[in-house]
A protein has these predicted regions:
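Conserved acetyl-CoA pyrophosphate-binding loop and the N-cap/start of the following alpha-helix
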Residues: 64, 68-76
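Conserved GNAT acetyl-CoA-binding A-motif
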Residues: 74, 79-94
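Conserved short alpha-helix immediately C-terminal to the canonical SAM/SAH-binding motif I
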Residues: 73, 97-100
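A conserved beta-strand-loop-helix scaffold within acyl/acetyltransferase catalytic domains
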Residues: 14-59
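Conserved catalytic-core motifs of GNAT/GCN5-like acyltransferases
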Residues: 90-92, 102, 107-121
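Short amphipathic alpha-helix that is part of the acyltransferase structural core
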Residues: 1-14, 32-36, 112
């Protein structure tokens, strides 16, 4: 439901499962309703977790956007990467969400490649 809501439903489920299995880190935010559990936010990372990691597939269901959930996902991911000792993280994003990552302190690639960089202190 989340992938459909954010327009990513074109990915075959089998391939998505394989990507998740091979990810370094997976984070999900669930709506707590025992009648209808719903994944409302998600993000994942790939990489070695020491020198580099790449953040992928950050998504928040449109009904829950604007409530700080995207920031919570990114804060959790960066805290986990710091804990692992990761030196650098990169991400790739659609142009419409680049201001979100700028507000979180990511350095955006100046040549318009839709990617950003984060460096550990």
């Amino acid at each position: 439901q989340l992938l459909e809501a954010v327009g990513w439903s074109r990915r075959p489920v089998r391939r998505v499962r394989k990507a998740l299995d091979n990810s370094l880190l997976r984070v999900g935010l669930w709506r707590h309703d025992p009648r209808i559990p719903r994944l409302v936010g998600f993000a994942r990372c790939t990489g070695d977790g020491v020198l580099e990691a790449t953040v992928w597939d950050v998504a928040v269901h449109p009904l829950y956007q604007g409530a700080g959930l995207g920031r919570q996902l990114m804060d959790y991911i960066l805290d986990a990467l710091k804990e692992m000792g990761t030196e650098r993280a990169t991400l790739f994003a659609d142009p419409g969400v680049l201001p979100f990552y700028e507000r979180l302190g990511w350095d955006l690639e100046p040549n318009g490649h839709r990617c950003g960089f984060w460096y550990s202190n």
